[in-house]
Amino acid sequence: MSTILSLAPQNVWKHFYSLTQIPRPSGHMEKITEFLLGFGKGLGLESFVDEAGNVIIRKPATPGMENRKGVILQAHMDMVPQKNNDTVHDFEKDLIETYIDGDWVKAKGTTLGADNGLGVAAIMAVLEAKDLKHGPLEALVTKDEETGMYGAFGLKPGTLNGEILLNLDSEDEGELYIGCAGGMDVTATLEYKEVAPEAGDIAVKVTLKGLRGGHSGLEINEGRANANKLLVRFVREAVASYEARLASWEGGNMRNAIPREAHAVITIPAENEEELLGLVKYCENLFNEEYSAIETPISFTAERVELPAGEVPEEIQDNLIDAIFACQNGVTRMIPTVPDTVETSSNLAIITIGGGKAAIKILARSSSDSMKEYLTTSLESCFSMAGMKVEMTGGYSGWQPDVNSPILHAMKASYKQQFGVEPAVKVIHAGLECGIIGAIIPGLDMISFGPTLRSPHSPDERALIPTVRKFYDFLVATLEQTPLK
């Protein structure tokens, strides 16, 4: 049995442990939905699944608290399925194996799922508790947040009654988030007719791995390497100098994760193999030098593979490579009025080329709607010039901060009373569901907070143990001090 069961507060960690025993990668919500629904009904609470697949559980106010504003406790049930290249794990079937490393809880070779499993676990602890004081509560556990916030988008007006929403999906304890970035998925596609490799050519598969990856919003400001952007530098030079031709490319697998790995199959004249291998080694050394202060050692390797039946036609190949090379990636602009806060960014997240089809997916973020439009139009122009069809989907506005929020003032006072310091009040460069839910329920007073997590969306994801108690104690105190209606 996992040692996390011995951690405090036990009522939170026991529920988180239960969540690690239920496969819940984005897109596969059946088991976790059934589990949460059974949990709520087992407590004798009104529990149901709405049309969008969200689980909603209602808990009445405790005696004497009926005159308090209703609170919606919100988290998402899915987790990002990322694993190390050498880890054997089927996220649809296998359980998450946790372990304790000093003050951190980690998973063995996979994402931990603390994003947002610890938020869900805290909600479960509150629903189960019989000794807490609180007003009317509604738990809203949304589906498929990580792949497009589909549960939040599908929420119908009138489903919930609360006036305050506490989103438990932030990742730095001691910080209260009052605003977030909006986003847009940009997808460029192209179909082509493959051509046969030249006679006498050989095929080489190059693989780039070992990058840190991470959350494409929270960690985009750190300048971490993007596997697709590194690989295109090599491929472009191989085409220009060694007559290489592109047969296929696979890089990244999640729209909101900085790609950690990418590989491509290229064909070259046999006599250029030695020079190509030299370029691989040169690029490996160069990338490690450029990112020595940021990345763990980057691995770039090459191996002979069977010659593919087809490859990308030369003109289309050159246009694709130029577009990938030119594509904006990383921070575009900081918020001028908020120090050290990213306003606008993009993540060249997923590239799939081969078999007569090319698809490139980018997630653009901005807390400014006008800058989001500027960035997405720039990306559209970049890939349109390469002859690709570009679609914009999944767009959502940011959450505009309200510094006069009643729940913000109450929580700031409560935090200082509990811990002796003021909490930091921030805007986050990530797509919290608050923006979407707030548009569906106008006037909702919202705050996002949570325990400290690091490297979410990557196998390095970890949760800082002492902050989980502080987070839960603060949540309980907030519920006890909910403003009057």
Predicted regions and their residues:
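Zn-dependent metallopeptidase/amidohydrolase metal-coordination segment
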Residues: 12-13, 336, 343-358, 422-477
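Active-site-adjacent substrate-binding region
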Residues: 219, 226-228, 232-249, 401-444
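Midchain, well-structured core segments that form catalytic/ion-binding scaffolds
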Residues: 23, 103-106, 146-147, 153-365
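Acidic, glycine-rich active-site loops and adjacent beta-strand->loop/helix elements
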Residues: 77-79, 140-148, 170-173, 212, ...
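Acidic/His- and Gly-rich active-site-bordering loop/insert found
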Residues: 3-103
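Substrate-recognition/cap regions that form aromatic- and gly/pro-loop-enriched pockets
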Residues: 341-430
